[in-house]
Amino acid sequence: MADRLRRTGRAVSSGDVALAKAPPLVFAGEVDQLRERLAAVARGEALLLQAGDRPGARAALSAAAVRDTLRTLLQMSAVLTYAASVPVVKVGRIAGHYPAPRTGDPGLPTRTYRAAASTLNLVRAFTTGGEADLSQVHAWNREFVTASPAGQRYEAVARGIDKALAFMKACGTDPAGLRSVEFYAAHDVARLDYASALTRTDSRTGAPYATSGHLVRIGDGDRPPDEAHVGFAARIANPVTVRLGPATTVDEVLGYVDRLDPDREPGRLTFALRLGAERVRDLLPELVEKVTASGARPVWVTDPETSSGAPGFDDVLDEVRGFFDVHRSLGTHPGGIHTELTGDDVARDRERPLDLAFRVAEFARSPEPGA
């Protein structure tokens, strides 16, 4: 274990050693299940919805903030599921987006671990304890549609969900899947010491898994991930998201494919794209065509809210529309969307992500590019 920690280029601290002995935050079987779900997304059989705290959010979230973040994500998911008529894989960057190491703070990794464990325990309780009941989630969406200035625009989708739920009730259908959900945690690997200390060898297969989160994310879109982060992601069995920006070249993307998905496994690799509304239609086609020609089947996700300059809502919508238009013109699958939530302000600021979900639902239901 100490040898693995030293590969990060740092001295091994007492906090690293403590984490190396700590229980995993997630389990290998859960990671494998997510890989199966992402493979379905890559094949065009599902969508991926990623959401979570903005970069720089503090490690610890209150129970109310966790609940409101999850509630917003579930509301978005219900709308997208109805609109696209496919399952929506829900991944939250809700337990593992923490600051880079600071000199003189050896206790930070341990505090990070405790905060993540607390958050994930709350998420598991909420997703199985009634908060995720589809009827309740739709009631929240109904409240949003009633209160929203754009409510009339969204009324058709809300009515359609009403009818679908009424039909299932009339048929006597009440599956357990309507009352609980699968929820997965994404972890930004800014801290290799933290992620390496929580890497475990699966007793079933002997493969290494990062147990700090089900899915690991590398890169920030503005700068490519460094060799150490790519090397770490290549060694583990977790699915990997690489964030790409407008300066990312086709050769760089093909390099990530070769390093991170040498076996060309559908869903092993996700590309989160922050290209900007003004450039997505120019840059995305070549990326998709060249990656597809390489034999890879990644999940393509649009990440419009972290494009440079804190884009306005109209720019976000235009980038999402461009993302869908490009994939439709190429005959490939627009795999999903990543959106930023706002920590303890989610309860107050959920209108924008919910507006986005209803507008994406319109794009998903529209048969023609640009409609």
What are the roles of these predicted feature ranges?
Residues 30-39, 70-83, 284-295, 321-329:
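Short amphipathic alpha-helices and their capping/turn segments at secondary-structure boundaries
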Residues 256, 268-273, 277-299, 306-346:
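Non-transmembrane, aqueous-exposed alpha-helical and coiled segments at domain scale
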Residues 55-56, 61-276, 320, 326, ...:
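Active-site-facing alpha/beta catalytic cores
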Residues 43-46, 83-86, 266-267, 295-297, ...:
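Short coil/turn connectors at secondary-structure junctions
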Residues 1, 13, 169, 290, ...:
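Intrinsically disordered, low-complexity proline-rich regions
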